[in-house]
């Protein structure tokens, strides 16, 4: 069993905001496998797929971003999952250009409140993640950065750019589950495989 959690905020008003990139990634993976993420479990919506013969639980916490750790830690306990080996978290990263992704084996949550909540709830930052770039593009970068930007619906052009990152995120998830985090880092953190240049 493997647990893949996408972070975001529930509610239609947040659906296509940069902060919901993790939810969008889980939805894209589920759609690709004709799965639905709708079962309520541990304060999250969940669904199941198979990757490389391994059962994968897809999850979207319903706790809102800042309390993501409540749902993630409950799922980890219920599924008897090891956060280092059996967990992968997908979330937005304001400091990466939109359309790019970074696969990390562990690390600081930096300023991401959802990642901070997970670190606090699990008692460790040693859990794999895919950070999905949502950094604003264009001349209004400085004006658009921050909380208001993260919670504002994306422009069509930015959504189109993000689609490429969601597709690469789905491939990265499959690689982590079937071949390991090290292989995924080598493959998806190379600039030529990672969307727009930083």
From Swiss-Prot:
Keyword flag Cytoplasm: yes
Per UniProt, where does tRNA bind? 14, 64, 66, 113
Q: Site Stabilizes the basic form of H active site to accept a proton: which residues?
A: 92
Q: Which reaction does it catalyse?
A: an N-acyl-L-alpha-aminoacyl-tRNA + H2O = an N-acyl-L-amino acid + a tRNA + H(+)
Gene3D superfamilies to which the protein is assigned, alphabetical: Peptidyl-tRNA hydrolase
- PANTHER family hit by this protein: PEPTIDYL-TRNA HYDROLASE
Task of the protein: Hydrolyzes ribosome-free peptidyl-tRNAs (with 1 or more amino acids incorporated), which drop off the ribosome during protein synthesis, or as a result of ribosome stalling. Catalyzes the release of premature peptidyl moieties from peptidyl-tRNA molecules trapped in stalled 50S ribosomal subunits, and thus maintains levels of free tRNAs and 50S ribosomes.
By what name is this protein known? Peptidyl-tRNA hydrolase
The species this protein belongs to is: Acidobacterium capsulatum (strain ATCC 51196 / DSM 11244 / BCRC 80197 / JCM 7670 / NBRC 15755 / NCIMB 13165 / 161)
């Amino acid at each position: 069993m493997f647990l893949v959690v996408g972070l975001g905020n529930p509610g239609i008003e947040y659906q296509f905001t940069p902060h919901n990139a993790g939810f969008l990634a889980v939805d894209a993976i589920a759609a690709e496998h004709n799965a639905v993420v709708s079962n309520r479990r541990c304060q999250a919506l969940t669904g199941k797929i198979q990757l490389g013969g391994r059962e994968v639980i897809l999850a979207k916490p319903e706790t809102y971003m800042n309390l993501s750790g409540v749902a993630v830690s409950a799922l980890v306990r219920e599924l008897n999952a090891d956060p280092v080996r059996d967990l992968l978290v997908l979330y937005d990263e304001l400091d990466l250009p939109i359309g790019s992704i970074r696969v990390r084996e562990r690390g600081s949550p930096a300023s991401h409140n959802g990642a901070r909540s997970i670190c606090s709830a699990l008692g460790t930052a040693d859990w794999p993640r895919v950070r999905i770039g949502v950094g604003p593009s264009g001349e209004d970068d400085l004006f658009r950065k921050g909380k208001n930007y993260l919670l504002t619906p994306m422009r069509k052009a930015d959504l189109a750019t993000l689609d490429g990152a969601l597709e690469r995120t789905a491939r990265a998830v499959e690689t982590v589950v079937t071949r390991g985090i090290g292989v995924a880092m080598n493959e998806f953190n190379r600039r030529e495989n990672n969307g727009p240049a930083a």
